[in-house]
Amino acid sequence: MGTRMFEIRANLENEYPDVYTREALAALDVLAKFDDERKAVMAARTSRRSARFRNKERIGFLDPSATIARTSIKVQDARDGNFVGSEIPKDLQRQWIQGTGPAAKPNSPLDKSIRNIAYALLSGADGWMFDGEDALGQITTMSLDNQRNLKLAIHRDSAFMKPAEQVAAEMNQWAKGFFGKPIIEDWVKQLDFTTKIFRARGLHLEDRQIRSAKGGGFSASIVDAALFLVNNYKRLRQDGCSLCLYLPKIQTAEEAALWSDILSTLEQHLGIPDGSVKVYVLVEQIEATFQLMEIRAALGKHFIGFNTGRWDYINAVSDAMAWDKGFVNPNIDAIVMTYGYMRVYEDRVRRACVTPDKMGQKALWQGGMEPNIPVGSEAGVSAAMKKAVAGAEREQREGACGKWVAHWKMVHIVRPVWEKVGEANQMGRKFPPLTYTKADADGLVLLEPAPRTVRGARDLLSVAMQYGNAFGQGMQAAALKPADFFGNEDVLYLMEDMATGEIRLSILWEWHHKGAAFTADDPDTGVKTGDRLTADLYKRLLAEEYEKLRKASNRDVHDNSKNTTLPIAREIAETYVLDDIKLPWYVDLLNINLNNHDLTEAKRRIRLLADAFRKDGTRITENLDFNK
């Protein structure tokens, strides 16, 4: 191999030869040309955001006469379905329940780490989105452990099969206690049931183990997609499984077109037909909701469906409207999928999915996440499971082909909602065609009356700090609840990932800098209805919630984190919320402190990042410890 367009950190190429294979590295070299284009597209994203703040502008629909960047497709043609999309492969036509979660655990030996995949593939879920993004820890070499584990499982290596047999027995033991019967009959056969899907990291993130040969970061998206597909495509195709990715954080059709170019180039390099790699797009950015059909068209033969999230989308709305003093969210518990702008967003997604393309092909709508876990008191679990089933029933009625769950124990609780109906999917449902009016645009930022309370602020702050702490420990998916409910088994833990941190600090920033009025008195603080979240009040709440976490049991806050990653999480929460310049991503502040437990150094890095963004919109996204 000649001179590469990238370099790999330390001795990792030798430590992970089964991941950094010759074939995978060759593919990365072919795709490396797209990294500069990605950086340009991300710079344009930052410029649009800055312009909205500067000019106090809302996001709008595209000019119907314009051409989608990187394509020859007119916007109006995309809206009319005048493009060629994709048929839905057989193993993706019925996706009633998709589980989500990483394929690795932090600081764990292989036989423990790989168990995550066994739980997933034995769960009975129709599909499992193995996460390389928001739910996967990025400390040390977790991204490589994730890829290694997936390859071992997909290829049925003995390193996977032995733990899988043990996991099957444990799952059945739990099921007998919860359901009164086992959930797995033939564990080896069961491994073939679930469609394997991978979520790559977003275009805005850079890999921690690879950087550009020219210096600076290198696309995490390209690394994730190349390593997963190159190392597994032959076996997946041999087994009759689709090559399927979830693409996160897409904001525009141009970004979707860049993804399409990356995937088509990889397919050509591998010698497989164009469109072999299928993708779902997570609609978690408000700008994407203004360009749904354009995104479908830009991805063309790759695209099979949209997914509707909650936390990430609320965060995107909050960020896009951060300039507008009149736009203030309520407590996030009130922002459910039937609330104002969320209801309008969900409706646009389902209407985009049932719009046929030139060949009459429609797309899948995968519903949102169920974060509950059936662990707690009998009363707490019963109430939470009724709520979870009711949420699934609502989505099924609205036209979703299925939904997500964050834990394998939820599969057999929620899946019967679709199983009873019996239809593989709901692409045949009829909804009104999409329209592009001012009223449509206004609906996407529609606020409705709901509480905004000190209790809500405490919950936001407590969970945000807990999540930042978990992230620093390598657990980007974590079971969390506000500190005031520690020890209360009637209040269940929710399985949360990076989105939970993003939205919580974003809304606290919004409340503080827009002078949001509380809607109820709070006896503990003396806050009265109409009072604001001042800097002094925020610092008081921060200190009180931080102290609760410091005093919490090891079960809720790991003791070894209380003098390492927890103080850093607190520092980030203070800087993010009190800075007058709203930083675009909480994850940036966490990423630059991965593997760093020194608070003084963390403060320096946090200030470095905030000052760089304040100066000219530069995001520090590369691994500052690459040479260590």
Describe each region flagged by the PLM.
Residues 2-628:
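Expand to "…catalyze enediolate/carbanion chemistry for C-C bond making/breaking, isomerization
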